Amino acid sequence: MRLFASHTLVAAALATAPALLSAQQVQGVKERVFSASERVGSGGEVRIYARQGDITISEGTGSTVEFRAEKDDRRGRLDEIGFIVRKDGDGVTICAVYADDDDCDADGLERRSGRWNWGRRSLHLAMTVKVPRGVHLRTSSGNGDVSLVAGVAEARVSSGNGKVRISGVNGRVDASSGNGEVTVDNASGPVQARSGNGDVTIGTVNGPVNASSGNGDIRVRMDKLSGSDDMEFSSGNGRVEVVVPSDFSAEVEANSGNGRITTDFPITIRGKLSPSRLRGTIGNGGRRLRMSTGNGSMEIRRAT
């Protein structure tokens, strides 16, 4: 399995794989604390990937990425985890890898053996990273919380099992957790947020926003909203609350399996009026707003 894998491997890539794998240098295998720093050009990309462990990212100064990882070996061995640092063009990739079984590139982590030995993967890892302002960031942990507070140009952040918290991003945000809360605050670009099992809370300066949860509440606040992009909010089991500017306009489609739908805005109803199903127009219409929940109330509120 590859974290953040997005490209199909082709025969030509496979033919050169042995040379690439053998060239990867795993560092810090026997060290309790590992540090690395790399310069990244303006607008460059920073990628931090880990099978497990908490990742805390903040804004640094200058044009250097500063990475520090601390191993807690009370329930495991120091040599379970090592690190691969790869500089490529105007970007850098840093991976925390299971030293005998992982490979690392710009798209993420990949296991060599295709098998997983859960019994000895018990070492806990805590990573802190300082990144230059304005970089593009991609980061993921297979099992751990991920926190980002930095004025990066855009961010793609995920956890397989942990909380995701993001604040201050100046552009697009893509945030997800397989099992944990997702919180995005003070974002000034489009936001896409997902949780398989947890609440999703978003506060943006400008929007638009799309959010979903398999089992959790969705709370979204947009102080401003430019453009006419469609938005969708859905929960399998939870309340959905969307706060929008007072000049908001949209074609609304809302459905609740078991709950009421309310709005602060005058709305022109289309079709049959129902407490759990709503079709109508707010303001001048335009963008499409879709909302749904299997079990919970839905609210469209006016920002104050």
Regions found by a protein language model. Give the residues of each.
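Intrinsically disordered, low-complexity terminal regions
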Residues: 1-304
